[in-house]
């Protein structure tokens, strides 16, 4: 297996109001018996990623109950599996995840003990169908440090400022990344799917932790200008 998967499913969305008062956004019902997270899980297994970690935090009960039926996604193989990580309160750690990078760092042992050379990171509440293998192939072909899956929004869409807005050159390299700007400079947005080498992710997370930084987008994608960031147009198939 070339990549392991990580699904970030711990966030709370105040925009959903009462809908998310007792349920994680990733556990929201979609067309009956499905949950929002099923799309990311299905994309993982359909892309032959058989080792997947889900990071949960907010209103985890219904989400964890749903994830316990992992046989639905065929993650039960000998060298794979579905792993669920929630914040662990210990003598050395007395707080919940302080951000997406902190969630990854608190579980860095999982990354260090894995052997896959690449990591695919996805949001647990994205509703889409996507072949992560195509993104991985583009990542390797470009020699990228980090690949960000993006999509062009229709000009003038009201909710474009809910996303990370990307400016890129003609080769697809990211030259500017602004998280949830008040005024968007382009209509190209990140859909919250990233590919990165596992060892490089570990190094960046350790640097962030040493500097007291906790957010994957703000403190890694936006801050580390030395990284070769490229876009993938795989999301155009959505």
What are these regions (language model features)?
Residues 29, 84-86, 148, 176-179, ...:
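Structural signal for conserved beta-strand scaffold positions within catalytic alpha/beta enzyme cores
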């Amino acid at each position: 297996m070339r990549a392991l998967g990580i699904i970030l499913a711990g966030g709370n969305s105040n925009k959903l109001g009462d809908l998310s008062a007792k349920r994680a956004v990733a556990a929201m019902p979609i067309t009956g018996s499905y949950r929002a997270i099923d799309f990311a899980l299905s994309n993982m297994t359909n892309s032959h990623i058989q080792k997947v970690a889900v990071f949960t935090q907010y209103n985890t009960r219904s989400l964890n109950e749903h994830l316990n039926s992992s046989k639905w996604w065929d993650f039960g193989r000998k060298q794979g599996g579905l792993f669920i990580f929630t914040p662990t309160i210990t003598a050395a750690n007395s707080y919940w995840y302080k951000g997406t990078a902190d969630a990854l760092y608190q579980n860095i042992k999982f990354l260090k003990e894995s052997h896959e050379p690449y990591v695919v990171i996805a949001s647990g509440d994205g509703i889409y169908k996507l072949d992560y293998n195509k993104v991985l192939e583009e990542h390797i072909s470009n020699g990228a440090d980090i690949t960000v899956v993006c999509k062009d929004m229709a000009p003038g869409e009201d909710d474009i400022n809910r996303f990370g807005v990307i400016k890129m050159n003609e080769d697809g390299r990211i030259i500017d990344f602004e998280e949830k700007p008040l005024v968007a400079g382009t209509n190209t947005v990140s859909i919250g799917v990233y590919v990165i080498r596992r060892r490089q992710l570990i190094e960046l997370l350790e640097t962030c932790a040493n500097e007291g930084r906790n957010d994957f987008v703000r403190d890694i994608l936006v801050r580390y200008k030395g990284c070769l960031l490229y876009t993938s147009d795989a999301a155009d198939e959505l």
